[in-house]
Amino acid sequence: MVRFISLNISVTALLLFSFRTHLTTAASTNTCVVAKDSSDDAITIAKAFEDCKTDGTVVFSKNTTYSLKSVLELSGLQNVNVDLAGTIELPARNTSYSTTSAFIHFEGSNINLYDALDHTAPPTILVSANDSSFGSFRIVNAPRAHMRIKNSNNILVHNVTFHTASSNICYLPKNTDALQITQSSNIVFKDSYLTVGDDCTAINGGVTNVTVSNIICNGGHGFSVGSLGKGGSTDVVRQVRVRDSTCNGCENGVRIKTWPGGQGSVSDVNYNNIILNNVDNPILVTTHYCDPNVIEYCNSNDTISLTISDVHFKDITGSVSALGNPVVNINCSSLTPCSDFTLSGVDITRVTTTSNNVCENLNGSSDISVCS
C-alpha cells in the first residue's frame, strides 16, 4: 500500500510521481522526513524515498513548501506511507514537459491518498490503478486537467477541492477539466467542490459504471459524457449516474457530446436531482460536437454518429442564463437518431430571450412534454 496524507499541491508546472510496482500493506518500520535543499528540493525528496522505499513512511512537514526545479520519478516503492502535510510547488512552466503523461502518476494497486496557463501540459494527476481511493486533497491553479483516471477499476475519488480560475479575461483557464475518466470501470466521484474552466466531469470512451454525486461545480462546462467518436473512432460508454449535484454559472449543465462520423454507443445514463444556476445550456445532447481547435475533425459525415439511448433526466431545476439558448437542446443525427429518452421534473427558470426547446432526431419526442 502507498498511503498519502494531507496533500496540498500548488500547481504551476510539473511534478511526476511514478509508482511502477504493485504494492501491498505492511507496517511502517522507518520514517524519513524530507529535508529542504538550497537549490532543488527534488534532490532531498528523492533521497527520502530511496531511504524509505520499503515498509517506510515519507513525511513532508506541515507549513513547509517544497520547491521543485526538476522532475521526480519515484519507483521501486513497496508498502510506503506518504504523509504530504506540506505544499509542493512545481517547476516553472516549461514546454519540454508537454509530452509527459502526467504531473503526478500513480500506477499500482491498493493506493490510498488521504487528507491531504500551459495548454499543452499534461494532467496534474494520472491514476492507473485498481481498488484505490483518493480523497481530501486540493489542487490549485492547474495548467490543464486536474485529474485523469485511465485503465483503472474500482476507484473512489472523494472530498477533493479543485480550484483553477483566472482574474484576467485574456488568459482563461481552458482545458482544465476537473476529472477525466477513460477506459475504466466502477468509478465513484463524490462530495467535492470544483472551480474549473472546462468539464466538471469528462466521461470518455471505454467507461462502464460511473457514479457522480454531491458535487458542486462553479464556472465549468458541466457534467459531461464525452466527447466521443472523434475522427470516426469507436467509443462505448454505459451505466452513468450523476445525482444530487450543482452547477453554478456553468457553460453547460448536463451534457452528452459526440463527434459527427463517430461510431459506438452511449446508453443507460441517468441525471437525477441536479441544480443548474444561471447556466447557458442546461440540458444538452449533441451528436454534432465540434472543437474549433481541431477543425479538421468537424467535417465528417454529419448524418451519423454514436447511438445514444436509454437516457433519463429527472428533477433538473434552476435557471438559464440570458444568452438565449434553449433549456433543452437534444440534437441527434438523422441516420442514428437518439431513442428511449425521458425528461421529468425539468423546472428551469427562463428569461424573455430563451429559445424554444429543441428535440431533433429523437425517437418518441412527441411523447415528451418538454419537446412539444
From Swiss-Prot:
It is found in: Secreted. Glycans are attached at residues 8, 63, 94, 130, 159, 209, 301, 331, 363. Its EC number is 3.2.1.67. Residues 1-26 form the signal peptide. The active site is at residues 198, 221. One of its GO terms (biological process) is cell wall organization. Optimum pH is 4.0. Keywords: Cell wall biogenesis/degradation, Disulfide bond, Glycoprotein, Glycosidase, Hydrolase, Repeat, Secreted, Signal. It catalyses: [(1->4)-alpha-D-galacturonosyl](n) + H2O = alpha-D-galacturonate + [(1->4)-alpha-D-galacturonosyl](n-1). GO terms for cellular component: extracellular region. PbH1 repeats lie at residues 152-183, 184-205, 207-227, 237-258, 303-350. Optimum temperature is 30 degrees Celsius. N-glycosylated. Its main location: secreted. Disulfide bonds join 200-217, 332-338. It comes from the Eukaryota. One of its GO terms (molecular function) is polygalacturonase activity. Belongs to the glycosyl hydrolase 28 family. Specific in hydrolyzing the terminal glycosidic bond of polygalacturonic acid and oligogalacturonates. This is Exopolygalacturonase rpg14. The lineage of its organism: Eukaryota, Fungi, Fungi incertae sedis, Mucoromycota, Mucoromycotina.
